[in-house]
Amino acid sequence: MPQKYSTLKNNINMLGHFLGETISDAQGSDILDLIENIRVLSRDSRSGDEKAREKLLDTLSTISNENIIPVARAFSQFLNLTNIAEQYQTISRKHIDQVASDRSLEALFERLKAQNVPAEKVISTVEKLLIELVLTAHPTEVTRRSLLHKYVEINRCLSRLEHDDLTQSESTKLKRRLMQLIALAWHTNEIRTQRPTPVDEAKWGIAVIENSLWKAVPDFCRQLNLHLEKNFGVQHSVNLAPVKFSSWIGGDRDGNPFVTAETTRQVLIMNRWKAAELFLADIQVLSEELSVVHCTEEFRAKYGDHLEPYRVVVKNLRAKLVKTVAYYGEILENKPSTINTNDILTDDQQLWEPLYDCYQSLHQCGMRIIANGILLDCLRRIRCFGLSLSHLDIRQESLRHTKALSEITRYIGLGDYSQWMEDDKQAFLIRELSSRRPLLPRNWTPSPETQEILETCRVIAQQPEGVISCYIISMARTASDVLAVHLLLKEAGVTYYLPVVPLFETLDDLNASKEVMTQLFNVGWYRGVINNKQMVMIGYSDSAKDAGMMAASWAQYRAQEQLVNLCEKMGVELTLFHGRGGTIGRGGAPAHAALLSQPPRSLKNGLRVTEQGEMIRFKLGLPAVAVNSFDLYASAILEANLLPPPEPKESWRAIMNELSDSSCNIYRSVVRGDKDFVPYFRSATPEQELSKLPLGSRPSKRNPNGGVESLRAIPWIFAWMQNRLMLPAWLGASASIRQSIEKGNKETIEEMCKNWPFFSTRIGMLEMVFSKTDTWLSEHYDLNLVKKELWYLGQSLREQLQADIKTILSLSHEDELMSDLPWIAESIALRNIYTDPLNLLQVELLRRLRENPENPNPDVEQALMITITGIAAGMRNTG
């Protein structure tokens, strides 16, 4: 490992040593010796020692039931500790000093100055900067909340140990604390015994805000200010909020029957309670600090003549926040309310105005340094989080709205709405939207499903404007899908305009998105209410599952490009909302590269993107890590707007059209066309066992009796990642490139790699995926778990994978994958030593469980779940 990563190597070794001591104390030296023997055999196996590989297989296939859990836990926990050390490395003082990122804001501002980009243009672009991250409860976060706190504490210890001026006693004390935390993690059950409820998931999301983002947002704003002042001599306005958060947790009911209107109501109250509690803590600090006596005459006239004028204002806010916390606490505990709503804070302006007045008065009285301290941080938090803590998105599938309207139209004698032609649906919806009379009959009793839809809309109607950020329609296909939701909201009593966002997910829907939006923009009623602003969500996971990575990527690019052009032509401000996952098969890519590969002008109104599952923890779980993530997002958005990527040449488009068609055909010929594929998939991966893992609150299938098409994108990806074939992330992509090269297009493809960020990012993503695949392990799953008559399919896929790797290497002109990113290659090689035993153990456990499905051994089931979470940690992504 290079010298600049010596801190990381030392930390990994130290944490591994402490884990070994913990295991020895808890389980005895014999177990530790067994674990160490497996580790050495795995290392030698990876180095090409066939005898070591055979011995490793023999050791893991004959392991006793009482030893499987500690062995699985040891390797799983080591991989978690490696992740902690790697996450800390990104914010380590020594690492930051040694590695100046050319992707940072600081580097971008220097580059803009060097390229003589006008300062006014930079400043105006920064003023419009918006990074809106949407936290989602997708069941990819396999780490329990009870462990997350311990992992954060381990990070803090690593940070303190990096100080050079520690005494021997201080260093010993910190290392002892590390050992305690690792022991606590070891003695904590890492597998949930029950699925989390949506409210449990909401608590997890709130914890991320409280423990990390609350500090990270003002820290990032301060950092942005420093760069602006240094390079352009200006300050970022306190009124602006470059970072905002929304959440799907408690609002996303697509396919999740456990998210009800009551769930949404409860989560909204929990958010308000926590926001009031967090602001109360800030205000208490301010009330102690602001003992200043001087203020402006305007301030004194507004708030009274007091010896300590700021303290009086702040203490008044403190009293209101105390009552606000108590008010929402009583609701959450189902207690009768004892507090008058006139005595609590319900609107951000009630908190903002007095604090902003304090800020301005301090500035005008020559106390800028005081104003720009904790008070400024608090103002930034009001603009970012507000009294609702985060905005909430509502999401539901289009068919649910259609069924609700069909029930209504049948009851009032108009026939079945779902059977009408699209033109008739639109005419009916526009007529009802324009009418002042209600559509819903007074004494009508809807079905429970329709009642739930209407109740959700009523919960929205009860919220102040802005608390609910938008209503997303998954599987949106037509203009009537959007108008239908507007009508349901109107009938529920929503008096303000709420953005209704179509989510285009499948290949066909992405290709039709321009036509759907054109129809909507041509509806007079619709243009009248949207105020020339439109949000459209682009689905990455379902389109990739539908058509393969390459075809989906190109469809997403073209859809965005067409929507940008359409909205510019129509005079509509477009915000594109990206529904990405953490994995390549679900649209994941390093944030900076992914954003610079977007179509030109697609980020001019900011970025809205989902942050999912374990990616929230990796990218936002620590304040300093979150600041780095914001910095990368901000620099990519600003670069995309100030130094936009090139428009693709027509020859590049022609190649991409060809690659899209051929890759989709190759992908579908396997996934849909081979009758043996589904039984092969179900036996070669732990897909069926995954459904038993109590990850998220949402069921893993839309239809419990369906095939691959009914499986959600997340378990689809997760299952293939477990057996190291990682099929969804590459199937069809490189094969289509190889076909195109054979037709004589190599020169054009190499030009695309060099000059087109969209294409080079796709190639880089494929290279990353290939570096995590393993044909030997995949074959081991087949030989032990798959019927012999299906082996041909796995063999064919592995041969294709190896050919695809050669194709990508021929484009990079390298002998090894990831040659240009040696640190990542090193990291994967290190992890393989610990992930391989988990894969081999998983095969053995699956074999044992499937041999006796009627009477599963609880220890075997528990160990299997540990291998699943451990492999997820080793791969650094799940779904």
Curated annotation (Swiss-Prot):
Coiled coil: none annotated. One of its GO terms (biological process) is oxaloacetate metabolic process. Pfam families: PEPcase (PF00311). Its EC number is 4.1.1.31. Its cofactor is Mg(2+). GO terms for cellular component: cytosol. One of its GO terms (molecular function) is magnesium ion binding. It catalyses: oxaloacetate + phosphate = phosphoenolpyruvate + hydrogencarbonate. It comes from the Bacteria. InterPro entries: PEP_COase (IPR021135), PEP_COase_bac/pln-type (IPR022805), PEP_COase_Lys_AS (IPR018129), PEPCASE_His_AS (IPR033129), Pyrv/PenolPyrv_kinase-like_dom (IPR015813). Keywords: Carbon dioxide fixation, Lyase, Magnesium. The active site is at residues 138, 545. Forms oxaloacetate, a four-carbon dicarboxylic acid source for the tricarboxylic acid cycle. Belongs to the PEPCase type 1 family. This is Phosphoenolpyruvate carboxylase.
